[in-house]
Amino acid sequence: MITWPAPQVPSIPGALTSVRVMDTSSGQLVETVRPGVGESSMYVCGITPYDATHIGHAATYIAFDLLYRAWLDAGQRVVYTSNVTDVDDPLLERATATGVDWTELATSQITLFFDDMSALGVLPPHTYLSAVESVPMVISATRHLLESGRAYRVPVPAQERPVHSPAYDIYADVTSDPDFGSISGYTSEERVRLFTDRGGDPATPGKKNPIDPIMWKAQREGEPGWDGDDLGWGRPGWHIECTTIAHCGIGRSCTVQGGGSDLIFPHHEMSSAHARALFGQDAGASVHAHAGLIAYQGEKMSKSKGNLVFVSRLRQEGVDPMAIRLAILANHYRDEWEWTSDVLDAGIKRHQLWLQAMSTNGGPHPGATLAAMREALSNDLDAPRALDAVDAWAYATLAGNDEDPGAPGVVSRAVNALLGIRL
């Protein structure tokens, strides 16, 4: 799938030498720029396109865009892969409820997502595949796990109206992975609760374990399906979709797997277990990094609650996308925080401050500002401290310190390259 256009990343003096990121599984800051290794790779889980991009989505993709930019500044070759789950239960349910063909709904929302990402200055993935495009890979992976005894069939009862008979859903057996649970560290009770709350089916008759994830869902009446040969007609499960797409774009292992903190379990736990089952116990990500969830009107922003703030709507109202990005960057990517009008107003004011300072004929020498930005970003992508460094430079500039006539240009390029803020 072709992504949105890549924004230009300008060259700036100096370079990062270290980029440490918090690893969820260990609870430690982990170095992601390895000595003698000129490449860093990242898989970030994509959207299910049944609604427009909200601020929570934007915050996650901006967080990992910071990591991408930090790696580039460190001289790394970056390999970035992502997905879009363009066939899944929530999408099909929304299409049915609105009377829109599911493919048209997915296409329209993917287009809007691309427009939002482009406007926000997010660097696109090199490999961007959809669930539909992953079908042949998922069939192969599911067959492999069946043959190795790590997956099993569960008959679909007639009351669920399977299109073909006999029909089987295929599940992965989580107990076949000795390292299952190593990412989240949750108890058995917590796993079942989260699996249930986040769309799982713990009570399905015939499952070996309540939290076994579906790999291949047999086609039901009114739903799309693909010919899986010996697997029967069906469609991919979410977790195996990401596993196969990550392997296609990056290989058996990557530097970072990223997403929102609501993906720690079951999604990242399951997709990592699939990777180990398919490619060996040392397969998967070296670091699992997670962005905090954003609240609105007192509750976590979610499609099910409907308490969403859409990027496209803010843009339609005339808000500069760079002000939106600045409002998001004012909070550390791992923090949970609430979107309010005051948060947006602060982003707008900061954007205006920076524009005013960058339009002057000189400013303080930029060396200390760039060093402070890099020091902040090297320590778990601390964007708020990087913003503070630019604020200090801007206030000094507007106070009349114009010692270096080239400073505004250098700082402008730096906030573009490191923070993704085009001025």
Curated annotation (Swiss-Prot):
Q: Which cysteines are joined by disulfide bonds?
A: none
- What residue intervals hold the motif 'KMSKS' region? 300-304
User: Sorted alphabetically, which InterPro entries does this protein's record hold?
Assistant: Cys-tRNA/MSH_ligase, Mycothiol_ligase_MshC, Rossmann-like_a/b/a_fold, tRNA-synt_1_cat_dom
Which residue ranges does the UniProt annotation give for the motif 'ERGGDP' region? 197-202
Instruction: Cite the EC number.
Output: 6.3.1.13
| A Pfam family hit | tRNA-synt_1e
List the cofactors.
Answer: Zn(2+)
Residue numbers covered by motif 'HIGH' region = 47-57
Gene3D superfamilies (UniProt xref):
Anticodon-binding domain of a subclass of class I aminoacyl-tRNA synthetases, HUPs
Residues noted as binding Zn(2+) in the record, renumbered to the chain: C45, C242, H267
Record's GO cellular component terms: cytosol
Q: Which reaction does it catalyse?
A: 1D-myo-inositol 2-amino-2-deoxy-alpha-D-glucopyranoside + L-cysteine + ATP = 1D-myo-inositol 2-(L-cysteinylamino)-2-deoxy-alpha-D-glucopyranoside + AMP + diphosphate + H(+)
- Entry's Gene Ontology molecular function annotations: ATP binding; cysteine-glucosaminylinositol ligase activity; cysteine-tRNA ligase activity; zinc ion binding
Give, as one word, the top-level EC class: ligase
Provide the alphabetized UniProt keywords: ATP-binding, Ligase, Metal-binding, Nucleotide-binding, Zinc
Q: Which family does it belong to?
A: Belongs to the class-I aminoacyl-tRNA synthetase family. MshC subfamily.
Protein function: Catalyzes the ATP-dependent condensation of GlcN-Ins and L-cysteine to form L-Cys-GlcN-Ins.
Under the subunit heading, UniProt states: Monomer.
Protein known as: L-cysteine:1D-myo-inositol 2-amino-2-deoxy-alpha-D-glucopyranoside ligase
Q: Quote the gene name from the UniProt entry.
A: mshC
